From Swiss-Prot:
Transferase found in the keyword field: yes
Organism for this UniProt entry: Vibrio parahaemolyticus serotype O3:K6 (strain RIMD 2210633)
Superkingdom, taxonomy of origin: Bacteria
EC number: 2.7.6.1
Binding site for D-ribose 5-phosphate: 196, 220, 224-228
GO biological process: 5-phosphoribose 1-diphosphate biosynthetic process; purine nucleotide biosynthetic process; ribonucleoside monophosphate biosynthetic process
Known role: Involved in the biosynthesis of the central metabolite phospho-alpha-D-ribosyl-1-pyrophosphate (PRPP) via the transfer of pyrophosphoryl group from ATP to 1-hydroxyl of ribose-5-phosphate (Rib-5-P).
Protein name: Ribose-phosphate pyrophosphokinase
Cofactor(s) the protein needs: Mg(2+)
Principal localisation: cytoplasm
Positions bound to ATP: 37-39, 96-97
Length: 314
């Protein structure tokens, strides 16, 4: 069996170290820095010939820098004769640009990134909770898109929720909400239906479902600025919700996210370490981070040993 080696870029070094610790191996020796003009500089400082190489790198902000680090590291490994190269991308950036809407003159950037990674020589991709599952079809190599839900469910089950209801923040998240509700014992779901009655009129948050006197669990794949999430939480509290928790795999937290979350009626926001939490977000006092390291370490072990990934979720 080829020797397994883990390497990390600069996007999520803490997560990479946690994964390495769980696999009882050291992170590989690689220098990932910048030339004086800002270009990515990579050097692999150990032998990887014939090795089963895993490169851990989220393509979160700064998205272009982190993507280029990943691409250049893959190329360096390929030129160093690595046996197999798996890109472990906990958060896959550009995933929200996955289609052309009404033939608009826009790119399908998720496809561009998939081609970029495939063409540079990656053999396999491991990621978590793609924003759109069909992105797997953009790749010409195998893609394992695993689910962060089990990590979030453990936390939900430990909180002693009072007569809980799972809430989808929009119509597009109903499938996720229903699956979460089923995993929690087939509990009720509610849906926040956001709509704008007419031009230049504020959005209205219509609530479908009963939340009065109940703990609400909002579930989503990611939180960006948090604006819609905070409005949804406000609508739930106005309808009599007891407590409101928000769960998401990816803590994008861009723009005014820190202020939005800090000043919101949300009781707690629970995310994972697919993206490192900024000091500004940590200072809000409302954000809890769960680690994906155990799940990713097990997935990496299974890939290296040619075992089933889907069996992890049976």
């Amino acid at each position: 069996m080829p020797d397994m080696k883990l390497f990390a870029g600069n996007a999520t070094p803490e997560l990479a170290q946690r994964i390495a610790d769980r696999l009882y191996i050291s992170l590989g020796d690689a220098s990932v820095s910048r030339f004086s003009d800002g270009e990515v500089a990579v050097q692999i400082n150990e032998n990887v010939r014939g090795s089963d190489v895993f490169i851990i790198q989220s393509t979160c902000a700064p998205t272009n820098d982190n993507l280029m680090e990943l691409v250049v590291m893959i190329d360096a490994m390929r030129r160093a004769s690595a046996g197999r190269i798996t890109a472990v991308i906990p958060y896959f950036g550009y995933a929200r640009q996955d289609r052309r809407v009404r033939s608009a003159r826009v790119p399908i950037t998720a496809k561009v990134v998939a081609d970029f990674l495939s063409n540079v020589g990656v053999d396999r991709v491991l990621t978590i909770d793609l924003h759109a599952e069909q992105i797997q079809g953009f790749f010409d190599v195998p893609v394992d898109n695993i689910f962060g839900t089990p990590v979030l469910l453990e936390d939900m089950q430990s909180r002693g929720l009072d007569n809980p209801v799972v809430v989808s923040p929009d119509l597009g998240g109903v499938v996720r909400a229903r699956a979460t509700a089923k995993a929690l014992g087939d509990i009720d779901i509610a849906i926040v239906d956001k709509r704008r009655p007419r031009a230049n009129v504020s959005e209205v948050m219509n609530l479908i479902g009963d939340v009065e006197g109940r703990d609400c669990v909002i579930v989503d794949d990611m939180i960006d600025t948090g604006g819609t999430l905070c409005k949804a939480a406000e609508a739930l509290k106005e309808r009599g919700a007891k407590r409101v928790f928000a769960y998401a795999t990816h803590a994008v937290f861009s723009g005014n996210a820190a202020d939005n979350i800090k000043n919101s009626v949300l009781d707690q926001v629970i995310v994972t370490d697919s993206i490192s939490l900024s000091k500004e977000m940590a200072a809000t006092g409302k954000v809890t981070t769960l680690s994906l390291s155990r799940m990713l370490a097990e997935a990496i072990r299974r890939i290296s040993n040619e075992e089933s990934i889907s069996a992890m979720f049976n």
